[in-house]
Amino acid sequence: MTNNLPPGTPAPANPELLLELLRYPMPFGKYKGRLLRELPTYYLEWFAKKGFPPGKLGMLLQTLYEIRINGLDYLLDELAKRR
């Protein structure tokens, strides 16, 4: 399925992706077992500098990083309240 958005237009947000940020645990490292949403911003900044891991985890961490640096945490807060 292709979208009809002009080039350079970001894709619409996937609500399932946001829900995964609420329930996906960090699988390794200092914060192993903590939900991604609970990770401190400095940890996400470190990944942004060093490189996000490949695959789904990296995509989720990068999404969370973008949410944080753009002040969009309220999106996750609202979703968490509705759960």
Go through each PLM region and give its residues:
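DEDD superfamily 3′-5′ metal-dependent exonuclease/proofreading module
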Residues: M1-R83
